[in-house]
Curated annotation (Swiss-Prot):
Species per Swiss-Prot/TrEMBL record: Endomicrobium trichonymphae
Enzyme class: isomerase
Binding site for ATP: T29, L30, G31, P32, D86, G87, T88, T89, T90, G413, D494
Function: Together with its co-chaperonin GroES, plays an essential role in assisting protein folding. The GroEL-GroES system forms a nano-cage that allows encapsulation of the non-native substrate proteins and provides a physical environment optimized to promote and accelerate protein folding.
Similarity comment text for this entry: Belongs to the chaperonin (HSP60) family.
Major localisation: cytoplasm
GO biological process: protein refolding
Name this protein carries in UniProt: Chaperonin GroEL
Catalytic activity: ATP + H2O + a folded polypeptide = ADP + phosphate + an unfolded polypeptide
UniProt-annotated location(s): Cytoplasm
Pfam families, A to Z: Cpn60_TCP1 (PF00118)
Subunit structure: Forms a cylinder of 14 subunits composed of two heptameric rings stacked back-to-back. Interacts with the co-chaperonin GroES.
EC annotation from Swiss-Prot or TrEMBL: 5.6.1.7
């Protein structure tokens, strides 16, 4: 395949054009008065969103050289979203400013690699300062503030704060499309896994179609149970205690299932049978989680334990079990607290060590089940288009909140970035080009606050100067209410992790673009013209 190449200023100019096209589409969404972008879809209604990464992902430019620039800035938004879950628009604004200012100086003859060194020095100093000024999140009110600012909606902020309070910072909070126009929160306490009863004959509450047991024993095994003889000795021991019980096994079928159902209908046994959750190695780990949570032992031949020889002390216990057609919930397992804490610590370590996003997600789900429970935010709206828009907001707010809890919060509205300028002014540069790199970062740090104010329809320069000259690190401008305030006290905050990640990723991609000298891409193929269609020959003239 033949290639086309462009060099030096021409290459950088093409990339800059692509960067600007993407960034200009994204940055209008920044701040409380930012606007929306409508994304056309080949099928169905268009998507209306103010989520930076969602907009960036949709943009592909016709010119291949311009598209390279756009795709690199898209990478800034995607990486920031992957790490921090929010701050994608801020990252894009920072990247555009760093690239534009850097290219001006390189075109004027500055050394690109020395500028890069200056940018790296300045960004490292700014990030250290962000970490220093970060304030730890201590209460539900501060959690609500983070979520409210991210979503530009106090109702969503309060809902996420409620969810986090109920399931803890490690708990699973999922966002789903609701069935009404109201946004609601459902919390499932205890451990829940996605396996329902093996037969509807186990149901005890016919109105809700749920099977409920109080203070039951729990048999946990990785075996497939088909013969009643395998579990009969253990059942006789349980019957003597007068307690109800649940069986969690790979499968319960044939004679064993029929006998359990028959005895349940007759009232001889209070029993529920469910299949074990997960598959393969993950199933083994989940059964072990259930065993530790309930104080039981997984009955498996791998450890030399057999069902027909099992004793009562191998069984788990819980205060309550609720099983419906699709899910099983174990409430208040009676496991040893120290063992549960050790298991939690082990899973946390695995989360840190794993490099697979899928494995990390599954480990976090397991952690949440052990720690506290699962909260579901059901997003409600009048139309499907509005629901999708609102769902993006809730997901961003949830990610921002988690980031805030993790690394603390800083003054929002672009103020934290602006205030780090004082640290950058003290950096010693090796030469004039490195100093230029530091000055490029100094100017870029004003980008987000300028954009927020411009999107609110105001003149940015006056506001930026006033905020910059104040010695109070929390002093800033509330663009929503058009007034100067203490940003922390006013609840206008950003997660430190989001601010830090946005700056790191913007600087990383900007440095790559600034040190680029050649662009190589395929020569676009010209599609052949279709030959003219057949038809009648021309009629003779008379």
């Amino acid at each position: 395949m033949a290639k086309q190449l462009i060099y030096s200023d021409e290459a950088r100019k093409a990339m800059k054009s692509g960067v600007d096209k993407l960034a200009n589409a994204v940055k209008i969404t920044l701040g409380p008065k930012g606007r929306y972008v409508v994304l056309d879809k080949k099928f169905g209604a268009p998507t209306i969103t103010n989520d930076g990464v969602t907009i960036a992902k949709e943009i592909e430019l016709e010119d291949p050289f311009e598209n390279m620039g756009a795709q690199l800035v898209k990478e800034v938004a995607s990486k920031t979203n992957d790490i921090a879950g929010d701050g994608t628009t801020t990252a894009t604004v920072l990247a555009q400013s760093l690239i534009n200012e850097g290219l001006k100086n390189i075109t004027a003859g500055a050394n690109a690699n020395h500028i890069k060194k200056g940018i790296e020095k300045a960004v490292a100093a700014a990030i250290d300062e962000i970490k220093k000024i970060a304030k730890q999140v201590k209460n539900k009110g501060e959690i609500a503030q983070i979520a409210s600012i991210s979503a530009s909606d106090k109702e969503i902020g309060n809902l996420i704060a409620d969810a986090m309070e109920k399931v803890g910072k490690d708990g699973v909070i999922t966002v789903e499309e609701g069935k009404s126009s109201e946004t609601t929160l459902d919390v499932v306490e205890g451990m829940q896994f996605d396996r329902g009863y093996s037969s509807h004959y186990f149901v005890t509450d016919t109105e809700r179609m749920q099977a409920i047991l109080e203070d039951p024993y729990i048999i946990i095994t990785d075996k497939k149970i088909s013969s009643m003889q395998e579990i009969l000795p253990l059942l006789e021991k349980i019957i003597q205690t007068g307690k109800s019980f649940m069986i969690i096994a790979e499968d319960i079928e044939g004679e064993a299932l029929a006998t359990l159902v028959l005895n349940k209908i007759r009232g001889t046994l209070k029993v529920i049978a469910v299949k074990a959750p997960g598959f393969g190695d993950r199933r083994k780990e989940m059964l072990q989680d259930i065993a530790i949570l309930t104080g039981g032992t997984v009955i498996t031949e791998e450890t030399g334990l057999k069902l027909d020889k099992a004793t009562i002390d191998l069984l788990g216990q819980a205060k309550r079990i609720v099983v419906d057609k699709e899910n099983t919930t174990i409430v208040s397992g009676l496991g040893d607290k120290k063992e549960i804490e050790a298991r939690i610590a082990q899973i946390r370590k695995q989360i840190e060590d794993t490099k697979s996003d899928y494995d990390k997600e599954k480990l976090q789900e397991r952690l949440a089940k052990l720690v506290g429970g699962v909260a579901v935010v059901n997003v409600g709206a009048a139309t499907e288009v509005e629901m999708k828009t609102k769902k993006f907001k809730v997901e961003d707010a949830l990610n921002a909140t988690r980031a805030g809890v993790e690394e603390g919060i800083v003054a929002g509205g672009g103020v934290a970035l602006l205030k780090t300028q004082t640290v950058l002014e003290k950096i010693n540069a090796a030469d004039s080009d490195e100093k230029t790199g530091i000055e490029i970062v100094l100017k870029a740090l004003e980008g987000p606050i300028r954009m927020i104010i411009e999107n609110a329809g105001l003149e940015a320069s006056v506001v930026v100067d006033k905020v910059k000259n104040s010695k109070d690190t929390a002093f800033g401008y509330d663009a929503d209410n058009n007034e100067y305030v203490d940003m922390i006290k006013a609840g206008i905050v950003d997660p430190a992790k989001v601010t830090r990640t946005a700056l790191e990723n913007a600087a990383s991609i900007a440095s790559l673009i600034l040190t680029t000298e050649t662009l190589v891409t395929d020569i676009p193929e010209k599609s052949p013209k279709f030959p003219g269609g057949g038809g009648m020959p021309p009629m003779p003239e008379y």
